[in-house]
């Protein structure tokens, strides 16, 4: 793409076919609907909270310099992805990572299950 190489990452959870795009050379991740400031939605029949967590696990370990989401603030710190992953882990440990689990507010972002 314009002399740049982007790796397509299948990151289901928000939707079955959700994808992120990883530009390893620059450390950019285009996260789409996986992570952004605002309310993340994992409450619809097409969402899967467990797969969402798996996608967060796989992407949070990338050596990111920039996190570029599809909504709201377009350039947010890459550490947000790790914070979202950690919160999803905590919800799983509490037995709340499931449809109907509730809405959980973490300040700059929230998740509705």
Q: What is the role of each PLM region?
A:
Residues 1-61:
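Catalytic core of the metallo-beta-lactamase
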């Amino acid at each position: 793409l314009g002399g740049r190489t982007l790796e397509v990452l299948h990151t289901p959870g928000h939707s079955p076919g959700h994808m992120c795009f990883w530009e390893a050379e620059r450390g950019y991740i285009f996260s789409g609907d996986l992570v952004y400031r605002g309310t993340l939605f994992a409450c619809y029949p097409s969402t899967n909270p467990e797969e969402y967590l798996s996608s967060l696990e796989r992407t949070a370990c990338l050596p990111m310099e920039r996190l570029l989401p599809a909504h709201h603030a377009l350039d947010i710190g890459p550490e947000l992805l790790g914070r979202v992953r950690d919160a999803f882990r905590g919800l799983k440990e509490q037995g709340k990572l499931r449809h109907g689990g509730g809405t959980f507010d973490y300040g700059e972002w929230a998740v509705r299950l």
